[in-house]
Amino acid sequence: MGELCRRDSALTALDEETLWEMMESHRHRIVRCICPSRLTPYLRQAKVLCQLDEEEVLHSPRLTNSAMRAGHLLDLLKTRGKNGAIAFLESLKFHNPDVYTLVTGLQPDVDFSNFSGLMETSKLTECLAGAIGSLQEELNQEKGQKEVLLRRCQQLQEHLGLAETRAEGLHQLEADHSRMKREVSAHFHEVLRLKDEMLSLSLHYSNALQEKELAASRCRSLQEELYLLKQELQRANMVSSCELELQEQSLRTASDQESGDEELNRLKEENEKLRSLTFSLAEKDILEQSLDEARGSRQELVERIHSLRERAVAAERQREQYWEEKEQTLLQFQKSKMACQLYREKVNALQAQVCELQKERDQAYSARDSAQREISQSLVEKDSLRRQVFELTDQVCELRTQLRQLQAEPPGVLKQEARTREPCPREKQRLVRMHAICPRDDSDCSLVSSTESQLLSDLSATSSRELVDSFRSSSPAPPSQQSLYKRVAEDFGEEPWSFSSCLEIPEGDPGALPGAKAGDPHLDYELLDTADLPQLESSLQPVSPGRLDVSESGVLMRRRPARRILSQVTMLAFQGDALLEQISVIGGNLTGIFIHRVTPGSAADQMALRPGTQIVMVDYEASEPLFKAVLEDTTLEEAVGLLRRVDGFCCLSVKVNTDGYKRLLQDLEAKVATSGDSFYIRVNLAMEGRAKGELQVHCNEVLHVTDTMFQGCGCWHAHRVNSYTMKDTAAHGTIPNYSRAQQQLIALIQDMTQQCTVTRKPSSGGPQKLVRIVSMDKAKASPLRLSFDRGQLDPSRMEGSSTCFWAESCLTLVPYTLVRPHRPARPRPVLLVPRAVGKILSEKLCLLQGFKKCLAEYLSQEEYEAWSQRGDIIQEGEVSGGRCWVTRHAVESLMEKNTHALLDVQLDSVCTLHRMDIFPIVIHVSVNEKMAKKLKKGLQRLGTSEEQLLEAARQEEGDLDRAPCLYSSLAPDGWSDLDGLLSCVRQAIADEQKKVVWTEQSPR
């Protein structure tokens, strides 16, 4: 055989004899392996065979098998010489590569572009050659697949055999089960038969007792007869002895008598008389035989008496058992009767309460109707007052125009008009009002001229003070001037809210006002021109206490310097057109909202708003929609959204908080924080975080949000929180804000719904949870609020709660839930879900140290009312008879003993426990059909089927989403039997005890 390294061209270099010697040496193998019908098409194209030769090889009747046809083909090719050998080898290369390698020692490497010179090369030939190669590869692949399928078939056959064996075992078990059922039924019938026999034996026993009494009476009569017979026998013996003695005596005395025959006859007669007196021997034998029979019957009666006594003892024992059962049945009957009576009393009490509630409901309906009527009347009055305010505002604008015209006249004319007491309109003054130190010390005050007093008193009648005070008015009727002045004076001393001197209200000296005294210290004002405002900030020149001078520029100077009390909240009313273009804010819910920059020349700048001023509340009622919001504990995003809506006349309640502003700036410069926001949320959906910088979040994960305006709007910056230490981890990034997250939640729910409609699979024990369905009640305040829907706002509602960061909208799905941490020191109670699995596990856990069932307590009606009023009732216990409740005292007593209380309550009781500052550990055991079969024995003890367990598990899984806390879930593939599940539950309880407890923070 040639070497493997030789090329195909070496075959053409060989001579004819060498080639045919190679093939003849392997002729036997070639003839057995090749199929002539596959080789002849190629040989015909190579022109070494003609059509007649092909028909002769394939259809000659002399060639009866394939070996003969292959041999004849070789003989024909041998006549063709070298070309026949080369063409045959090339055909073997395509159709029998292993034979080609055996003959030539070369690998069958097919080069489609290099055929031998025996046939014309064309694209069709190359294509056919390629097709042959691909078909050979497919054939090899199919052979491999066939082998794999054969092995798979063998494995399946083995599995089938095992399954058949298992089925036979199951059939055997079923047969045994049916046999045991039949045996149990037979035993049951046997027990019934034995009971019947026992009853019949008791009847026989009573009959035997009667027979015993009869036999005893008969025995006594026989004994009496025997006694009489004995007495008669003794009497006869005595008579016979006496007769013998008399006979002997008579014989001795009559021995000498001669007449012995006569004596003998006499004795015989006497003997016959005696025999007549005594019994005959036959009668005696009869009496002895009857006596023996009586003794035998007596022995039988004694034995029967003993057996009847034993039966009597057994019957007495059974009678005592039946008596005890009767006593227990009577006791249960009494308990049931008492429970029925208590239930009847409870139903009567509930019916009475329902009647009272119906009465209260009717009263509430009537009160609601009256309140609605009052509200509608108040709204009508408010609308009329608002129209009056608009009319007065127009009058104020006209008066301001007149003041500017009068101000343009020379000062001499102004003084002359002042002497003649004519009204002198001046340019709009800025009223500066501040709290003074020791205001009572300045007792003297000079009055301005009567001309200015008359002017300012006329202006006060139509001044915009009514517009400003209308914000404070609690009554729909407009207040009088004196009440307004009195209210202004009382604001300084009593209320924490004080009006600033920056209100745009032209006022004169309070001494000219009706009802005001010249020395009233509460009305220290300083009328300044707009041009003199910068000088006011640098210095305040006091005037003499005797009089109040008016400078040439028309500035009414203050009597003495004053200082502002920084802790007071000041209300500023001004024209806030596009308020966020006038000011920029920083801060958040942790630090408060501060003014950071003020646009020079804006209305906010004219109102002396400066960086570092904290905004407490915004009141925007000048136009629709109306709102009033507290900004002390709101996030930066919400504050920006609120202030962006302000576009017109508004009121800002502000206070100076320099220390807080400086600390915030230091944290921002040191990059300790990016804003003043800080709160914790629970994420109710899974987010992948595909973009760069986004945080990948799982459902039910707790995050610490530190910035709600991170890199602009639309996203928050959050840190993942350590479950054990509550510290921020290194994993941080951006998450969508509330509105975007809500859209993602809706889209995710829609996708899941479409997938469920296509392939319905049970969710229990499936992959990781993607969505937690949490909805909020629109009647309550949202737990977190980000922005406001203009179409949904109520004008009369006060917006802004310390925990309200979320948006109001028509959608009630909650993507984020505001949570707060707790660290309980004592062992927490344990609540297992589903409840059926919890009951099975509680029986095992209560046997271990550190676990104990929390039993329901029996409470009387008075105790129940007292405990319920204190809020110490958790849930009614599942005990027959009622009035058994799971109480706070029972749970806390176990917690004080350093023991985990095993609770058997519903999931809605978790909210009740949280109100008691008790935070249970909720363990959810995922159950599917396979796992339910492993709990079959425990379910049978509870009287529950597998289908009922699966249905209850599906219902309670839905209730888990509404629970106000996190829970630990155990996958069904994490345990194989009840002991494995018990160890998993213990490990989960120990792990949850170490973690921080996160509960939902309800709105205040």
UniProtKB/Swiss-Prot annotation:
Phenotype for R151W: In PSORS2; uncertain significance; decreases NF-kappaB transcription factor activity
Effect of E142G: In PSORS2; increases NF-kappaB transcription factor activity
InterPro entries, sorted: CARD, DEATH-like_dom_sf, Guanylate_kin-like_dom, P-loop_NTPase, PDZ, PDZ_sf
Residue intervals of the CARD domain: 15-107
GO molecular function: CARD domain binding
Modified residues (Phosphoserine): S544
Coiled coil region boundaries: 128-409
Known tissue expression: Isoform 1 is detected in placenta and epidermal keratinocytes. Isoform 2 is detected in leukocytes and fetal brain.
GO cellular component: aggresome; cytoplasm; cytosol; plasma membrane
Residue ranges annotated for the PDZ domain, each copy included: 568-658
Region (Maintains the protein in an inactive state): 409-568
Keywords from the UniProt entry: Apoptosis, Coiled coil, Cytoplasm, Disease variant, Phosphoprotein
Guanylate kinase-like domain residues: 807-990
Origin superkingdom: Eukaryota
One GO term of the biological process aspect: tumor necrosis factor-mediated signaling pathway
Effect of R151Q: In PSORS2; uncertain significance; decreases NF-kappaB transcription factor activity
Effect after changing G117S: In PSORS2 and PRP; may result in altered splicing of exon 3; increases NF-kappaB transcription factor activity; enhances CBCL10-MALT1-CARD14 complex formation; enhances MALT1 protease activity
Medical condition linked: Psoriasis 2: A common, chronic inflammatory disease of the skin with multifactorial etiology. It is characterized by red, scaly plaques usually found on the scalp, elbows and knees. These lesions are caused by abnormal keratinocyte proliferation and infiltration of inflammatory cells into the dermis and epidermis. Pityriasis rubra pilaris: A rare, papulosquamous skin disease characterized by the appearance of keratotic follicular papules, well-demarcated salmon-colored erythematous plaques covered with fine powdery scales interspersed with distinct islands of uninvolved skin, and palmoplantar keratoderma. Most cases are sporadic. The rare familial cases show autosomal dominant inheritance with incomplete penetrance and variable expression. Familial PRP usually presents at birth or appears during the first years of life and runs a chronic course.
Biological role stated in the UniProt entry: Acts as a scaffolding protein that can activate the inflammatory transcription factor NF-kappa-B and p38/JNK MAP kinase signaling pathways. Forms a signaling complex with BCL10 and MALT1, and activates MALT1 proteolytic activity and inflammatory gene expression. MALT1 is indispensable for CARD14-induced activation of NF-kappa-B and p38/JNK MAP kinases. May play a role in signaling mediated by TRAF2, TRAF3 and TRAF6 and protects cells against apoptosis.
Quaternary structure note: Interacts (via CARD domain) with BCL10 (via CARD domain). Forms a complex with MALT1 and BCL10; resulting in the formation of a CBM (CARD14-BLC10-MALT1) complex. Interacts with TRAF2, TRAF3 and TRAF6.
UniProt comment concerning the protein's domains: A linker region between the coiled-coil and PDZ region holds the protein in an inactive state.
Protein name as catalogued: Caspase recruitment domain-containing protein 14
Species, as recorded: Homo sapiens
Lineage: Eukaryota, Metazoa, Chordata, Craniata, Vertebrata
Gene expressing this chain: CARD14
